[in-house]
UniProtKB/Swiss-Prot annotation:
The name this protein goes by in its record: Small, acid-soluble spore protein O
Lineage, opening ranks: Bacteria, Bacillati, Bacillota, Bacilli, Bacillales
Keywords in alphabetical order: Sporulation
Chain segments carrying region Disordered: 1-48
Main location: other
Keyword Cell cycle: no
Gene: sspO
Length: 48
């Protein structure tokens, strides 16, 4: 079996264009969580 290059070595593989539409991180698109959602996130994190 031939050794395969890691994804971060392949040129452009980390670009959002390669990963499909909407893969880029949009900073101003953050929505503020309500208190209930925040509590739910804490529960989910402990379950992982």
């Amino acid at each position: 079996m031939a050794k395969r290059k890691a994804n971060h070595v392949i040129n452009g593989m980390n670009n959002a264009k390669r990963q499909g539409n909407g893969a880029g991180y949009i900073e101003n698109d953050q929505h503020i969580l309500t208190e209930a959602e925040r509590q739910n996130n804490k529960k989910r994190k402990t379950n992982q």
